[in-house]
């Protein structure tokens, strides 16, 4: 079959990115909109802890998908993807209409609609890693990077939308000469939470439409021996040598694929297993840090330097994710040693941020421009480096086909869960970290 025309790969990259955008957009949108909804919901600022628990419980989606695969082996893999997408679209649409509804539970008012829909969306998002990723085994490895770019957009776009909305804007009143300064003055948002959730629904609709477009580009593969993945997209097509090279860590060498098949080499299989385990371990560890440990301390590490530092860290850190995916499209590290070195750089930046959070509300260089630059740069480097490692490790695992990508999705989700569980006691039970109040200077001596 002829190689794909120049327009088709570009369109496929775009559709894959939009498809990936729908993976975590719903839960990311809920997180960035919490400062708005807590003003009207009865849980107040206890609401984030409720959402954290619900997102952790959302990992039950992994069990549901596993059970479905056991009960219906060999069934169409599009079914769970469509279920996840429908849950996301319907959940955010209902959230836009019902988020402010409350009901009495055990004699107290609770935001039952908001919490129930947040749980449904958490189920869908957690299941996306083990449904969306295996589907990409039908595409050459370079499109996997577009998927992770889309996942980065699922965090960046809700952040940008919240900034346009005016989330978190406040003004400190002038301090009196003798006396305590008054409370900070909050600005009214430019549009309500319902509008935000409708916009989020539109993003998920676009993601579902992109998946349908991918299905049109990639009809079911014909029953031919090997190589073809769909119409116009081939692993073995001319010009695809780079795909074979980067997927080789988990693929059979060409010398063995052709001619007589030699007997199994136990040592080679052992090395192959060790390499795969290292890549999966890197995926689990990096996602534990970026999706569990570090988000729990972001406000503690940034807010002592001011709201501007916090917003810059959130937005630029989210932008670092898709930028790292762009970099991986051109330069992909295929060495375990190289990925390990990059991971150590990310751990160093993460350790600095954790130290700032522990020392909050009076970390080093507070009140200086250097402190703001360092904390923002550390967040950008940390999230960017770990995003690159995640994309590179997943690209190398792509050669193992659908089972390897399924294992990658499980590693990502399990790592995220372990990171979140590890941070729950120090943040919510033992209160190791201390926040800084707005318009107050506890470090002024």
From Swiss-Prot:
Residues 228-264 are annotated as: Disordered. Residues 247-258 have a biased composition (Low complexity). It comes from the Eukaryota. The chain crosses the membrane at residues 14-34, 47-67, 86-106, 112-132, 147-167, 196-216, 277-297, 312-332, 339-359, 366-386, 404-424. One of its GO terms (biological process) is riboflavin transport. Riboflavin transport is Na(+)-independent but moderately pH-sensitive. Activity is strongly inhibited by riboflavin analogs, such as lumiflavin. Weakly inhibited by flavin adenine dinucleotide (FAD) and flavin mononucleotide (FMN). It catalyses: riboflavin(in) = riboflavin(out). Changing residue 339 to P: In BVVLS2; loss of riboflavin transport; loss of localization to plasma membrane; no effect on protein abundance. Keywords: Cell membrane, Deafness, Disease variant, Host cell receptor for virus entry, Membrane, Receptor, Transmembrane, Transmembrane helix, Transport. GO terms for cellular component: plasma membrane. It is a multi-pass membrane protein. One of its GO terms (molecular function) is riboflavin transmembrane transporter activity. InterPro entries: Riboflavin_transptr. Changing residue 123 to P: In BVVLS2; strongly decreased riboflavin transport. Changing residue 284 to D: In BVVLS2; loss of riboflavin transport; loss of localization to plasma membrane; no effect on protein abundance. It is found in: Cell membrane. Highly expressed in brain, fetal brain and salivary gland. Weakly expressed in other tissues. Disulfide bonds: none annotated. It is linked to Brown-Vialetto-Van Laere syndrome 2: An autosomal recessive progressive neurologic disorder characterized by early childhood onset of sensorineural deafness, bulbar dysfunction, and severe diffuse muscle weakness and wasting resulting in respiratory insufficiency and loss of independent ambulation. Because it results from a defect in riboflavin metabolism, some patients may benefit from high-dose riboflavin supplementation. Belongs to the riboflavin transporter family. Plasma membrane transporter mediating the uptake by cells of the water soluble vitamin B2/riboflavin that plays a key role in biochemical oxidation-reduction reactions of the carbohydrate, lipid, and amino acid metabolism. Humans are unable to synthesize vitamin B2/riboflavin and must obtain it via intestinal absorption. May also act as a receptor for 4-hydroxybutyrate. (Microbial infection) In case of infection by retroviruses, acts as a cell receptor to retroviral envelopes similar to the porcine endogenous retrovirus (PERV-A). This is Solute carrier family 52, riboflavin transporter, member 2.
């Amino acid at each position: 079959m002829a190689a794909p025309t120049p327009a088709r790969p570009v369109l496929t990259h775009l559709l894959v990115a939009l498809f990936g955008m729908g993976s975590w957009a719903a839960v990311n949108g809920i997180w960035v909109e919490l400062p708005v909804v807590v003003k009207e919901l009865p849980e107040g600022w206890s609401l984030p802890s409720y959402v954290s628990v619900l997102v952790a419980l959302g990992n039950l989606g992994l069990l549901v998908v596993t059970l479905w695969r056991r009960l219906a082996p060999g069934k169409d893999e599009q079914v769970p993807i469509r279920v996840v997408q429908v849950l996301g679209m319907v959940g955010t649409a209902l959230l836009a209409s019902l988020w402010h509804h409350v009901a009495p539970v055990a004699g107290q008012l609770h935001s039952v609609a908001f919490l129930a829909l947040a749980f449904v969306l958490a189920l869908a998002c957690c299941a996306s890693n083990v449904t969306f990723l295996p589907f990409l085994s039908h595409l050459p490895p370079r499109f996997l990077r577009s998927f992770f770019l889309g996942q980065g957009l699922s965090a960046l776009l809700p952040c940008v939308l919240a900034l346009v909305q005016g989330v978190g804007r406040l003004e400190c009143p002038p301090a009196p000469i003798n006396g305590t300064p008054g409370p900070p003055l909050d600005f009214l948002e430019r549009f309500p939470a319902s509008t935000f959730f409708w916009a989020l629904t539109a993003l998920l609709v676009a993601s579902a439409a992109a998946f349908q477009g991918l299905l049109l580009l990639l009809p079911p593969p014909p029953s031919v021996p090997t190589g073809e993945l769909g119409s116009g997209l081939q692993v073995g097509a001319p010009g695809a040598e780079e795909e074979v090279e980067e997927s080789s860590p988990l693929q059979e060498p060409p010398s063995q694929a052709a001619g007589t098949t030699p007997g199994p080499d136990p040592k080679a299989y052992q090395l192959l297993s060790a390499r795969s385990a290292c890549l999966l371990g890197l995926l689990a560890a990096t996602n534990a840090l970026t999706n569990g440990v570090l988000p729990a301390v972001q406000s503690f590490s940034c807010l002592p330097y001011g709201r501007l530092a916090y917003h810059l860290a959130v937005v630029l850190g989210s932008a670092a994710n898709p930028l790292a995916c762009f970099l991986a499209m051109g330069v992909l590290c295929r060495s375990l040693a190289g990925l390990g070195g990059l991971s150590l750089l990310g751990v160093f930046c993460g350790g600095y941020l954790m130290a700032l959070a522990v020392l909050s509300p009076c970390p080093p260089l507070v009140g200086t421009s250097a402190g703001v630059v360092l904390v923002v740069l550390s967040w950008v480097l940390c999230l960017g480096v770990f995003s690159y490692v995640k994309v590179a490790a997943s690209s190398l695992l792509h050669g193992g086909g659908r089972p390897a990508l399924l294992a990658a999705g499980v590693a990502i989700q399990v790592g995220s869960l372990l990171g979140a569980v590890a941070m729950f006691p120090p943040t919510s039970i033992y209160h190791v970290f201390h926040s800084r109040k707005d318009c107050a200077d506890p470090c002024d001596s």
